Swiss-Prot record:
Protein known as: Acetyl-coenzyme A carboxylase carboxyl transferase subunit alpha
Annotated PANTHER family: ACETYL-COENZYME A CARBOXYLASE CARBOXYL TRANSFERASE SUBUNIT ALPHA, ACETYL-COENZYME A CARBOXYLASE CARBOXYL TRANSFERASE SUBUNIT ALPHA, CHLOROPLASTIC
Upper lineage: Bacteria, Bacillati, Bacillota, Bacilli, Bacillales
Similarity remark: Belongs to the AccA family.
Pfam families to which the protein is assigned, alphabetical: ACCA (PF03255)
Length: 317
């Protein structure tokens, strides 16, 4: 059963009441058709009111939903003949990042993304989508290979952050992320980055330097989690909801600030409600981006990417 978020409970309660009335009607001689139709109209209005007016904290909850589609869900639906590569050729394999090659509309591309698990066992194996340095080095190796063979790069971002453990730090976590930022800025192929869940801090940025940055409607992208920000600002992590309201971490806010290029719509109730439809919406955005970026020369791709990031954070008084 799909977990229910707290703000969705009025919708679920009304749906249960409709099901109850339908069952009663089928098993009795009393016709409640009009009452059911009235409740269904009320349900439609309620869904529109709740899902159409989500607060930042609600979007954080949606981004963290345990059933939210992962990178692999989209790879299976958008790309063909995908072959995953493994290892960074320095230390080992990191299953928190998936990286490989495949075809998009009959054209070869390199696809890289954070990968969470679907259950406890897989989450432990994939370290809950929090990469070690070898994950970022693996990704960079494949991005450099993409440049060598002139393949566009598409990345899917979905991580709470890079793994902060002692072993990861000893193996150069910060250096691995920093090198990815530097190298991605200068790669002479199109790079499209899509935030599909949580885009947490440097762990997200390690796959997030691109020509086009897109976000799903209910994803988040921030330098720190709302809980972390609340702990720093108010010494109280339970103030996360308040922090989320002020941090500007949602797709609509980041689009307005010029951090991202497009907000990708989600099916009503979130991407997990209809993965196929969500994949189709992402597919359309990838197609639009590639059509635009493939017209640019390698020099123009790099120049526009540099210009994009140089303008971030500027403002006029």
């Amino acid at each position: 059963m799909t977990p229910i978020l707290d703000f969705e409970k009025p919708i679920v309660n009304l749906k249960e009441k409709i099901v109850e009335l339908k069952s009663f009607t089928e098993n009795s001689e009393i016709d409640l058709t009009k009452e059911i139709e009235t409740l269904e109209e009320r349900l439609a209005r309620l869904e529109e009111d709740i899902y159409g007016n989500l607060k930042p904290w609600n979007r954080v909850q949606m981004a963290r939903h345990p059933d939210r589609p992962t990178t692999m869900d989209y790879i299976e639906r958008i790309f063909t003949d995908f072959i995953e590569f493994h290892g960074d050729r320095f230390y080992g394999e990191d299953e928190a990042i998936i990286s490989g090659i495949g075809y998009y509309k009959d054209s070869p591309v390199t696809v890289i993304g954070h990968q969470r698990g679907k259950d406890t066992k897989e989450n432990i194996r994939r370290n809950f989508g929090m990469p070690h340095p070898e994950g970022y080095r693996k990704a960079l190796r494949h991005m450099q290979q993409a440049e060598k063979f002139n393949r566009p790069i598409i990345t899917f971002i979905d991580t709470k952050g890079a793994y902060p453990g002692k072993a990861a730090e000893e193996r150069g976590q910060s250096e691995a992320i920093a090198k990815n930022l530097m190298e991605m800025a200068g790669l002479q192929v199109p790079i499209i980055c899509i935030v599909i869940g949580e885009g947490g801090s440097g762990g997200a940025l390690g796959l997030g330097v691109g020509n086009h940055i897109h976000m799903l409607e209910n994803s988040t992208y921030s330098v720190i989690s709302p809980e972390g920000a609340a702990a720093i600002l108010w010494k109280d992590s339970t103030q996360a909801k308040k922090a989320a309201e002020t941090m500007k971490i949602t797709a609509p806010d980041l689009k307005e600030l010029g951090i991202i290029d497009q907000v990708i719509s989600e099916p009503r109730g979130g991407a997990h409600r209809d993965v196929d439809s969500q994949a189709e919406l992402i597919d359309n955005i990838i197609k639009q981006s590639l059509v635009e970026l493939m017209l640019l020369s390698s020099e123009e791709l790099v120049d526009k990417r540099w210009e994009k990031y140089k303008q971030m954070g500027t403002f006029m008084s």
